[in-house]
Each structure stands twice: as structure tokens, then as C-alpha cells.
């Protein structure tokens, strides 16, 4: 059942990305972030009330840090989705396991450990080779800044995932983590809309059309439902199965790009995306195996 939950989450996240790209014709990225948080928090609050959950927390600073890093990552990814082909933006954003691997190697080097895992080095090398192949059209079309934002969003997403795990270990339920994240979305989106330069045309807020309002509602609803499905998958499924099946989001996004925007990629772009996908799966496998070994070692020492 967990496999179905992660497939549903990946499908909904890909639809959300497509809706963000469509909505960018009528709204700024700041507005989309704001409404994503507003619609999502209303739906989530109704769910929490129905389930009898509580929002009071003793870990507010942790939630704010996670929310701040998460919303910057989300903002960068939304921006990238408006500038790049959807599949390319999603692929770069899904590189979190690679950045985690880079951090693990950097930490090992900092601690003076002589042995550095060769599988991780290989995965990192292959992934960056894939990035160079996939980035070529972006540089030719002067889309390098959007590509940079997509890559950085993946870096911050890796940090945000680490903070989510820490909050979970502290006893915070996932709905509470998501609620405070959405609250930060609202605050950041509102602030970004009011700042000078928040919108390309200078307008802080744009009037709603039926199409625009429908897209915003869909972005908020699909985002929160995808998050809940993802949570259920991680809670009930095996780590490796869930982690690897989430990459189906790249496939779904490729389909939307072809159907809606008629995206056509050269062979080297497809090869680059495949290399990134394969190396991310390998890094996920190795990272998970390393965490299991570390947990077993801690259990044996107690």
C-alpha cells in the first residue's frame, strides 16, 4: 500500500508543478507561494480538527527554521519551474540525495577520516555529468539562472528533510510540521509580494480570473494532499522502496511537459536526466544503508 501512496504523492506533486508553471502567467512567484500556503493551511486545519490533533508545540524554533529553509527551497523551485522545462526543473530539484552524499563526504573529510566511500564518489561524479548534459539547452537559451535556482532548491530541500527528521524524532507529528511550514509560506509569500520588485510588472497583488483562481486552489490542494500521501508512504513503507518510487515524479513531469508545452529534448538531455536519476537512486540506497549501519552500531553500544 505504501507504494501506491508514494505514487499518488509523486503524481500530485507533478500536477502541482504543472499548475505553478501555468499560474505564473497571471501571478508572481511570491503570490503563488502565498496562496499555496493559504489554501493548504485551511484544508490541513480542517483535517486536524477532524482528527482531534493539537497545534501547540514545544519546538517552535525548530519549526520556524525548517519552515524558513523549506520556503526558500520551494520559492527557488517555483521560480525554476516558470523558467525551465518542467521535467528539467523537477530533475534538478530531486537531487537531494546527491547533496546529502556530498555533505556526508565533506563531514568525513572534516573529521579526518581517511576512508571515503567510493560508491558515493561515483554517484556524485555521474550525477554532475548528468547535470552538465541536461544543462546544455538551458545555457544556450539563457536560462542558466533558472537552472541555478533549481539546483540550489535541491540543496536546501536536503537540509529541510534533515530538519523534518529531527522534529519527528522529537515527537512532532507530521501534520504539525506541515502546518507550520504552510504558515511560513503565507508570511514569506505576503512579504515577497509587498517588497519592491516582488512582481515583474510591479503589482503587489493581481486580480483573479476564474482560470487563475482555479489554478491557485489546485496548487494549494494538490500540495497538501501530496504531502499527506507522502507522509503516509514514509510511515508505512520501506525506506528504499518509498525513496526510489518518488522519482516517478520526473516521469510524470516529463509527460505534462510534452502534452502541455510540447517540450522536445535532444538525446543528451534525456541521457543527463537518466544519469541524475540513476545516481540519485544509488545515493539513496547507500545513504539508507549507512544510516541503518549507524543505528545498529548505536544499538549494540547501549
Can you name each region flagged by the protein language model?
Residues 102, 116-136, 268-287:
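Hydrophobic transmembrane alpha-helices of multi-pass small-molecule transport proteins
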Residues 1-2, 27-72, 99-103, 126, ...:
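Transmembrane alpha-helices of multi-pass small-molecule transport proteins
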Residues 1-9, 49-78, 145-153, 203-225, ...:
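Loop-to-transmembrane-helix transition segments
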Residues 79-82, 97-119, 251-270:
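C-terminal transmembrane-helix exit sites in multi-pass transporters
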Residues 89-95, 171-184, 224-259:
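Helix-helix packing/entry segments at the starts of transmembrane helices
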Residues 1-31, 125, 141-166, 296-302:
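Glycine-/small-residue-enriched transmembrane alpha-helix faces in small-molecule transporters
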Residues 247-302:
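C-terminal-most transmembrane helix of multi-pass membrane proteins
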Residues 44, 138-201, 207-208, 299-302:
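Transmembrane alpha-helical segments that form core, pore/gating elements
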Amino acid at each position: 500500500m505504501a507504494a501506491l501512496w508514494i505514487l499518488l504523492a509523486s503524481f500530485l506533486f507533478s500536477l502541482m508543478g504543472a499548475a505553478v508553471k501555468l499560474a505564473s502567467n497571471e501571478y508572481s512567484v511570491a503570490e503563488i507561494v502565498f496562496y499555496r500556503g493559504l489554501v493548504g493551511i485551511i484544508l490541513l486545519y480542517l483535517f486536524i480538527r477532524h482528527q482531534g490533533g493539537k497545534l501547540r508545540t514545544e519546538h517552535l524554533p525548530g519549526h520556524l527554521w525548517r519552515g524558513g529553509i523549506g520556503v526558500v527551497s520551494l520559492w527557488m523551485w517555483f521560480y525554476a519551474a516558470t523558467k525551465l522545462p518542467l521535467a528539467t526543473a523537477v530533475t534538478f530539484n530531486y537531487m537531494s540525495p546527491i547533496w546529502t552524499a556530498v555533505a556526508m563526504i565533506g563531514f568525513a573529510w572534516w573529521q579526518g577520516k581517511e576512508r571515503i566511500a567510493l560508491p558515493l564518489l561515483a554517484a556524485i561524479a555521474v550525477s554532475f555529468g548528468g547535470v552538465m548534459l541536461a544543462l546544455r539547452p538551458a545555457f544556450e537559451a539563457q536560462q542558466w539562472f533558472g537552472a541555478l535556482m533549481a539546483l540550489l532548491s535541491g540543496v536546501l530541500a536536503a537540509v529541510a528533510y534533515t530538519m523534518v527528521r529531527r522534529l519527528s524524532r522529537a515527537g512532532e507529528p507530521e501534520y504539525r510540521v506541515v502546518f507550520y511550514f504552510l504558515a511560513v509560506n503565507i508570511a514569506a509569500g505576503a512579504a515577497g509580494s509587498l517588497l519592491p520588485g516582488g512582481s515583474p510588472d510591479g503589482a503587489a497583488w493581481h486580480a483573479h480570473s476564474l482560470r487563475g483562481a482555479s489554478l491557485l486552489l489546485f496548487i494549494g490542494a494538490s500540495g497538501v494532499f501530496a504531502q499527506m500521501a507522502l507522509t503516509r508512504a514514509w510511515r508505512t513503507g520501506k525506506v528504499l522502496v518509498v525513496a526510489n518510487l518518488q522519482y516517478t515524479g520526473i516521469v510524470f513531469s516529463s509527460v505534462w511537459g510534452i502534452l502541455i508545452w510540447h517540450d522536445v529534448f535532444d538525446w543528451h538531455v534525456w541521457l543527463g536526466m537518466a544519469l541524475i536519476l540513476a545516481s540519485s537512486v544509488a545515493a539513496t540506497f547507500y545513504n539508507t544503508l549507512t544510516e541503518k549501519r549507524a543505528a545498529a552500531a548505536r544499538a549494540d553500544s547501549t
